[in-house]
């Protein structure tokens, strides 16, 4: 199957989660999720005193529904109303607290946190919030006590240790802060944080030698991580080692696709400026703790807890652009695009992140079905940044997702015209324009674009599959086409669309046993795709398994295929396939089921 769906996002500024995953072991993440408090967990109805079902139970159930939709503000309101009806209910108290915290309703969250720790003194999230409150008030002994109470579970222990180290630094005791950091385990993920925060604390404390050694160690282990790179480069330039700062940033950029912040920092340093340290106060340092861990959690399956940690970071440091971006990403994953827009709106236009963030706003507007607003925003960005490929690429993707292929092709062509010498990084533009040309039935132009994409990046499975499938469908270059499709399947053997392409190619070439084998596998991988089920039905019919064929066609019909496919399926269910060999080109691309959701 040709899957020509537009890419969902491009050039999103984010904390380097791929690097995070290398030092945050999967076992740790599993332990976190198993050990985490009941953030948005299911609650037994029996735990709610239903003596007043019209009010208490109604608010409770409405809160659960809103919580399931990640509408934390509405859920918090319902749970708070339920709590007012049953103030002694510990389950409702905890849920109300967590939801108020996730919604950044700090006055109410703090009140509930104080109530919660009276019942459950070791409640980690409540103790973290109370620790942050005491820290902001300069009550460092009290903050230390709250953070110490939260040490249960791997992430809580890590967070508590880092937070307590920053408390000691705030109290003017950096040596005690270092001693606390030394208590972290020898695991790679823990040592990453130990080196990173040791360097930050040392810089804030004016201990430049210690900072340099710690940050050098962190950068050596993780040169692709944005925050480590920024911290080390800023340390170097403030230590009058401008050459090291430039070298650090260039090494980072050579190992990554580049980030607006690292590129802007390199430009500033090359221009003779001396940017400030990454963290200039203990409050910023504590915010960095919750930002880094929260962003990692949100990207590794701990979405609800990640949002809470990111809210903590902004409670401590309201002007924190990267935390705003991370929170927006989390809302995007939760499909709360309205909140995503609000988070992005907190990024000032002067920030190096601004253009990338505006592009992501366009995708969020598209997700809210506000397509005209999305296009208007991108058109304005294109006008303001006429030499930047990114807004044109985004416009093409969004137009293609709505099958507005002419507008998509125009956007991609304008983007390609800005590239004097295409490189491997530009393959997706040619692929995307190729798909648009193919849908506009301009095959010569489509073929040229797809070939160009493959020449730029020969291992791109999506291009191999699309071009190979298109050739087979037209009876062209059959040997090369099959080689391409097989290579795509080899690169991504668990991709049902590629396996379907291989099976359908065998079907078109008359190798029915091989076709059935591959199409059965494709249905296993993508049981909810109407096109793949239809393909298996056709192949089953041709080898005489007519009952199975009708079952697959009926299954395909139940999966809401496109209207033109419905007529064909109903006809096949009634009369089967004609005896003559299949010769009609199969433009069953599955694009509708894979439309851009973002």
PLM features: residue spans?
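Alpha-solenoid helical repeat scaffolds
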Residues: 42-71, 76-529, 534-598
């Amino acid at each position: 199957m040709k899957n020509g769906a537009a890419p969902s996002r491009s050039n999103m500024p984010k904390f380097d989660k791929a690097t995070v995953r290398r030092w945050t072991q999967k076992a740790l993440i599993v332990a976190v999720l198993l050990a985490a408090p009941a953030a948005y967990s299911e609650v037994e109805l029996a735990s709610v005193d239903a003596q007043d079902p019209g009010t208490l139970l109604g608010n409770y159930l409405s809160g659960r529904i809103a919580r399931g939709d990640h509408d934390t503000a509405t859920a918090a309101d319902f749970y708070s109303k339920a709590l007012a009806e049953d103030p002694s209910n510990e389950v409702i108290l905890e849920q109300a607290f967590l939801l108020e915290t996730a919604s950044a309703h700090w006055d109410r969250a703090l009140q509930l946190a104080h109530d919660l720790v009276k019942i459950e003194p070791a409640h980690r999230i409540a103790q973290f919030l109370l620790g942050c409150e005491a820290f902001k008030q300069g009550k460092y002994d009290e903050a230390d006590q709250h953070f110490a109470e939260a040490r249960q579970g791997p992430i809580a222990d890590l967070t508590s240790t880092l937070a307590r180290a920053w408390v000691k630094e705030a109290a003017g005791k950096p040596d005690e802060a270092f001693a606390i950091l030394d208590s972290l385990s020898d695991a790679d993920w823990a040592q990453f944080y130990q080196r990173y925060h040791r360097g930050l604390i040392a810089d804030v404390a004016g201990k430049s030698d210690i900072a340099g050694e710690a940050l050098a160690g962190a950068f050596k282990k993780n040169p692709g991580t944005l925050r480590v790179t920024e911290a080390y480069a800023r340390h170097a330039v403030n230590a009058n080692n401008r050459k090291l700062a430039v070298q650090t940033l260039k090494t980072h950029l050579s190992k990554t696709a580049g980030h607006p912040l690292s590129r802007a920092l390199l430009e500033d340093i090359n221009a003779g400026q001396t940017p400030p340290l990454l963290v200039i106060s203990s409050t910023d340092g504590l915010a960095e703790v919750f930002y880094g861990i929260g962003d990692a959690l949100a990207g590794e399956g701990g979405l609800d807890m990640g949002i809470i940690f990111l809210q903590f970071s902004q409670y401590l440091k309201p002007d924190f652009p990267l935390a705003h971006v991370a929170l927006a990403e989390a809302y995007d994953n939760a499909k709360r695009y309205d909140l995503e827009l609000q988070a992005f709106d907190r990024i000032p236009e002067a920030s190096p992140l601004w253009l990338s963030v505006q592009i992501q706003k366009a995708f969020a507007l598209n997700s809210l079905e506000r397509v005209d607003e999305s296009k208007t925003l991108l058109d304005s960005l294109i006008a303001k940044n006429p030499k930047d490929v990114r807004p044109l690429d985004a416009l093409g993707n969004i137009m293609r997702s709505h099958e507005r292929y002419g507008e998509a092709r125009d956007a991609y062509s304008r983007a390609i015209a800005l590239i004097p010498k295409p490189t491997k990084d530009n393959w997706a533009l040619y692929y995307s324009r190729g798909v648009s040309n193919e849908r506009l039935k301009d095959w010569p132009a489509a073929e040229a674009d797809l070939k160009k994409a493959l020449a730029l990046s020969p291992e791109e499975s999506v291009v191999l599959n699309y071009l190979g499938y298109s050739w087979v469908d037209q009876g062209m270059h059959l040997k090369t086409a099959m080689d391409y499709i097989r290579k795509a399947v080899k690169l991504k053997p668990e991709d049902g669309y590629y396996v379907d392409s291989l099976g359908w190619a065998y079907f078109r070439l008359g190798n029915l046993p091989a076709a059935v084998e591959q199409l059965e596998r494709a249905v296993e991988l993508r049981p909810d795709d109407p096109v793949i089920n239809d393909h298996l039905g056709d192949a089953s019919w041709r080898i005489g398994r007519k009952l199975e064929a009708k079952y697959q066609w009926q299954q395909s019909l139940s999966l809401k295929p496109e209207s033109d496919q419905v007529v064909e399926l109903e006809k096949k269910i009634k009369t089967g396939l004609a005896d003559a060999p299949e010769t009609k080109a199969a433009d069953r691309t599955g694009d509708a089921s894979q439309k851009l959701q973002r």
